[in-house]
């Protein structure tokens, strides 16, 4: 059977449901697919389809995630839903499911709970740009005043984490009633999706950003020069353009004299392409895995940064023992391991801790032995002897 072609006639946006356990994230996700399926914009899925999320591995970490897709009039969405709280933490920190925005699900019967707060904090820390609130289980609350109080509480909570609490839409829904086909509540799901369309900005396409390719391999072609291969992370590169080689050693300038993909010559390579770039005047010894090729002047290498880190439990293949400040692991950044040191850390809420236990989430300061192209929002893994013991996201560049 021929593979169905992915139609690119609508902008694509990645979103997900976040919020406290049992507030109805998965039921709401199922309800969205069912309501949109009636207009031919999704395949209807029930709770069980989504809840039985398969395991995935991302940077050596096992995560359960369910993926559904659907469309609205103006957009195509890929939507992620995670069964367990730990899956959310791992998913958001590893960037396994990069979110352009999220639907925060909060039950009107409970109001904001511990994980509601934790997911809002996590969304802020990993750079989820926009939220829409689905106030769920509204069919179970008769008193309009209670609903108003819960809405106020949610807005104050969003404000306290630097989201624009007053402006974020809060839509009253009942995932369960919509799933049962109650037309009043079905129309509320449509209202929610209109709010998502309007409030979650369309992401800048990777291809429109400045060029960057992490070097995976280097070889020389007799009579032609040195070729660096890798996947173009963003932007595009044309034959004849100047690019900089950044990281590990001093930054240097070179010219791209050829772009190859699947042994064919191209005029240009763009985001997502796996290419070989022929570089003028560069010896094989001058360039190595872990460096990046970038648009001139678009990026500088750094050695010191702050990060949000999830440290793997022993059962997940992580360490069996705690570590302390001064710990020297490898940081796996893009395509290579760089030795570094964790010079300081606090728990994720900013309180002081003496040591880090497997399973902890921390804020840490890291220092690398050589400068590499790190950027805010970038993901990395922490490794020890080739195995992953933690995953993180760069929250701030220090030096």
From Swiss-Prot:
* EC number(s) stated in the UniProt entry for this protein: 3.6.5.3
| Catalytic activity entry | GTP + H2O = GDP + phosphate + H(+)
GO MF annotations for this entry?
Answer: GTP binding; GTPase activity; translation elongation factor activity
Q: Per the database record, which ranges form the tr-type G domain?
A: 10-204
InterPro entries named in the record: EF-Tu_GTP-bd, EF-Tu_GTPase, EFTu-like_2, EFTU_2, G_TR_CS, P-loop_NTPase, Small_GTP-bd, T_Tr_GTP-bd_dom
Residue positions binding Mg(2+): 26
Please state where this protein is localized.
Answer: Cytoplasm
Function, please?
GTP hydrolase that promotes the GTP-dependent binding of aminoacyl-tRNA to the A-site of ribosomes during protein biosynthesis.
Q: What is this protein called?
A: Elongation factor Tu
| Source organism (scientific name) | Prochlorococcus marinus (strain MIT 9301)
Q: Gene that codes for this? A: tuf
């Amino acid at each position: 059977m021929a593979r169905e072609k992915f139609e690119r006639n609508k902008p694509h946006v990645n979103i997900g449901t976040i919020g406290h356990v049992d507030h109805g994230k998965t039921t709401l996700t199922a309800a969205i697919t069912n309501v949109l399926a009636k207009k031919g914009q999704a395949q209807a899925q029930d709770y069980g389809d989504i809840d039985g999320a398969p395991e995935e591995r991302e940077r050596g970490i096992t995560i359960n995630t369910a993926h559904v897709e659907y469309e609205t009039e103006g957009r195509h969405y890929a939507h992620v839903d995670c069964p367990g709280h730990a899956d959310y933490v791992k998913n958001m920190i590893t960037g396994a499911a990069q979110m352009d925005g999220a639907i925060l699900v909060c039950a009107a019967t409970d109001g904001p709970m511990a994980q509601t707060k934790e997911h809002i904090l996590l969304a802020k820390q990993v750079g989820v740009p926009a939220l829409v609130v689905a106030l769920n289980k509204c069919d179970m609350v008769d008193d309009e005043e209670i609903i108003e109080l819960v809405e106020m509480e949610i807005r104050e909570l969003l404000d306290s984490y630097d989201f624009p609490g007053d402006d974020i839409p809060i839509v009253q829904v009942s995932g369960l009633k919509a799933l049962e086909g109650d037309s009043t509540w079905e129309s509320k799901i449509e209202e929610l999706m209109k709010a998502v369309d309007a409030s979650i900005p369309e992401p800048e396409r990777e291809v429109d950003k400045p060029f960057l390719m992490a070097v995976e391999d280097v070889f020389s072609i007799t009579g032609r020069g040195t070729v660096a291969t890798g996947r173009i992370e963003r932007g595009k590169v044309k034959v004849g353009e100047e690019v900089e080689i950044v990281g590990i050693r001093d930054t240097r300038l070179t010219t791209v004299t050829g772009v190859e993909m699947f042994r064919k010559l191209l005029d240009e390579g763009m985001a997502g392409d796996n290419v070989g770039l022929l570089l003028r005047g560069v010896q094989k010894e001058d360039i190595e895995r872990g460096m990046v090729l970038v648009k001139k002047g678009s990026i500088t290498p750094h050695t010191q940064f702050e990060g949000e880190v999830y440290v793997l439990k022993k059962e997940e293949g992580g360490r069996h023992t705690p570590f302390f400040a001064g710990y020297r692991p490898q940081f796996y950044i893009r395509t290579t391991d760089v030795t570094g040191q964790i010079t300081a850390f606090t728990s994720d809420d900013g309180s002081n801790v003496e040591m880090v236990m497997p399973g902890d989430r921390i804020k840490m300061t890291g220092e690398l032995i050589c400068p590499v192209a790190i950027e805010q929002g970038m993901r990395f893994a922490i490794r020890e002897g080739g195995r992953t013991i933690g995953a993180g996201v760069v929250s701030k560049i220090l030096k």
